[in-house]
Amino acid sequence: MLFRSAQLAAQHAVSAPHHGWWRDNTIGATPQANGTTPSWAEFFRERRLRPQLALAVFRGFAALLEAPGERLLEGVEALLGSHRPQPALLHGDLWGGNWLATPDGEPVIFDPAVYYGDRETDIAMTELFGGFAPRFYQAYAAVAPMPPGAELRRELYNLYHVLNHANLFGGGYAANARRMIDRLLAELRT
């Protein structure tokens, strides 16, 4: 059974005037701040990356992540460039473990970390831990194609989830987060 990309695209078509949500929630067991902002770059930097980096420093990853993470925070606007996405209703934690099919074959998503933001974040997350079937992405792109620059943004967006996993589970994820930060900083230098 394939999670239905048309349903996800329809969910992403639901919009709001600002990025964020009316209340804070969690991403896994980690608090997730959702205060609204009109700017996607500001929201992603201040409500997603900065809190996860601060928590990583608190959890003992300062030597590995603090200085490069701060440099990356300064470059978020440059990485996003002119990308100004319409706030879309997001699942927020959409990976293969957060959907299943009912006995009659209907897909159901669960364990959301809901907010309004760039729809690309949901698609990026689906690719982080193994991904969905290729036809899912083909069908989604047929309904809602990805704009130019999505591949670079995918790395930035998935950094949030890798940092969260570092904060929840430790070591290997922190090293992976550092590699992602280094690749993104290299993009800023080009």
What role is predicted for each listed range?
Residues 3-10, 71, 75, 135, ...:
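Alpha-helical elements of Rossmann-like donor-binding domains used by nucleotide-donor carbohydrate transfer enzymes
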Residues 12-19, 56, 80, 144, ...:
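A general structural signal marking secondary-structure boundaries and capping sites
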Residues 165-190:
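ATP/Mg2+ or Mg2+-diphosphate-binding catalytic cores
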Residues 156-165:
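Short helix/strand-capping connector loops at secondary-structure junctions
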Residues 62-79:
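Short, conserved active-site entrance elements at the starts or edges of catalytic domains
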Residues 1-63, 86-87, 116:
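A cross-family kinase active-site recognition segment
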Residues 3-6, 68, 83, 131-134, ...:
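Phosphate/dinucleotide-binding and metal-coordinating scaffold of catalytic cores
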Residues 34-45, 54, 83-89, 96-155, ...:
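Active-site Asp-x-Gly
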